Amino acid sequence: MGDTRVTVIGGGLAGTEAAWQLARAGVAVELVEMKPERRSPAHVLPGLAELVCSNSLRSDNPLNAVGLLHEELRRLGSLVLGCADETRVPAGDALAVDRERFSEAVTARLTGHAGVRIVHRELEELPPPPALAVIATGPLTADALAARLAETTGGRLHFYDAIAPIVAAESIDRSIAYARSRYGKGSGDDYLNLPLDEAQYHAFVEALLQGEKVAAHGFEEPRYFEGCLPIEVMAERGLEVLAHGPLKPVGLEDPRTGRRPHAVVQLRREDVDGTAWNLVGFQTRLTWPEQRRIFRAFLPGLANAEFVRLGQIHRNTFVDAPRVLAPDLSVRAAPHLFLAGQITGVEGYVESAACGLMAARAVLDRLAGRAFRPPPPATALGALHRHLTGEAHPPGYDYQPSNVVFALFPPLTGRHRGKAGRKEAHVERARKELAPWIDSAPPTAVPAAPAAG
């Protein structure tokens, strides 16, 4: 494969991981990074793989879905995990890094690899066929390239995350929540409903108004689409605005009383098996501690809520992956282009790196004339792939970015003792499925990354 050059656009976690995996497999790579010619407002370091927000790659415990993803990436020779392990700082069971040393380590690995050529310039056009390219430009993709991508994908490009919190099903108090679709439509159990009387509703609105908000970054303009306003912004427009908006009770009478509550919080099934539920319309800029406090204290039925994901809104460029991408992460309308990282709708540093690894393996399969072999669905990598293809979500799901969570995994079979038992079963099954997948694909399975010299 050495005479074939693949272009990778973007030097973040997804792009550097994709470039590394391709180069280690013998493919010549041109890695295009716009720094220092142009910087997004979020970037300050000179090197590749800059961690913009947190320095944490989250839990390293495999009983956590992201920790299991760490383990799988290490087994596949991940550049990002290798450099993170070398530059880690004490953080309990989390994998946190010295972000400057981490960026330097990734940059050194790639600049030191004979198969990688790094070009510092901004691209305003997508590479033409037939040469293959991986687009990994991240959540702050430059405007010109974003416009070309929107044209290529038929306009299916989103510019803001509208992420609502997700609650574990087992932590919802079913003595308070009731199953009902508005006006009785659907199967009847598509939604759970949390009823609020007038006093409860007013107390909740007041808590929203007083709650601590995340300060907008300088590169995030505080302007919102009317279709995805933060709940606290709606609350600022008037006391009853939410009760006439996402919390409207019309058609949601409580079957136990036969009466319509003053307001209703709807929870929508997040996965096919109903293990996680999305708080409908609850995109928010409340800080994560405030979300936990306010939603548990003021929403009936969520006093003991376990949050699988917390809400947020921020600038993000991502495609509607299940409709735009083929299973091998290539663009359906332009098969020579592969997407990787947050632009596909994965959320998080580690998930971005994992997506870069999957895209690289897909490119290798394409170059070898093989059909793409996706990771086994019960692995953490496979769960992310299920998210990207839509297999992890019910029909009609409104595609939004997601971290890797156990709710994306296929359901377990048999009985398992409590939450810990279910997590252990997920991990055991994932490990069993990953090993034969690696063994069956030696041309695309790479050796572990060498230590930095």
UniProtKB/Swiss-Prot annotation:
Belongs to the MnmG family. TrmFO subfamily. Its EC number is 2.1.1.74. Its main location: cytoplasm. It catalyses: uridine(54) in tRNA + (6R)-5,10-methylene-5,6,7,8-tetrahydrofolate + NADH + H(+) = 5-methyluridine(54) in tRNA + (6S)-5,6,7,8-tetrahydrofolate + NAD(+); uridine(54) in tRNA + (6R)-5,10-methylene-5,6,7,8-tetrahydrofolate + NADPH + H(+) = 5-methyluridine(54) in tRNA + (6S)-5,6,7,8-tetrahydrofolate + NADP(+). The lineage of its organism: Bacteria, Pseudomonadati, Myxococcota, Myxococcia, Myxococcales. FAD binds at G10, G11, G12, L13, A14, G15. Keywords: Cytoplasm, FAD, Flavoprotein, Methyltransferase, NAD, NADP, Transferase, tRNA processing. Residues 441-453 have a biased composition (Low complexity). Catalyzes the folate-dependent formation of 5-methyl-uridine at position 54 (M-5-U54) in all tRNAs. Residues 433-453 are annotated as: Disordered. One of its GO terms (molecular function) is tRNA (uracil(54)-C5)-methyltransferase activity, 5,10-methylenetetrahydrofolate-dependent. It comes from Anaeromyxobacter dehalogenans (strain 2CP-1 / ATCC BAA-258). This is Methylenetetrahydrofolate--tRNA-(uracil-5-)-methyltransferase TrmFO. It is found in: Cytoplasm. It comes from the Bacteria.
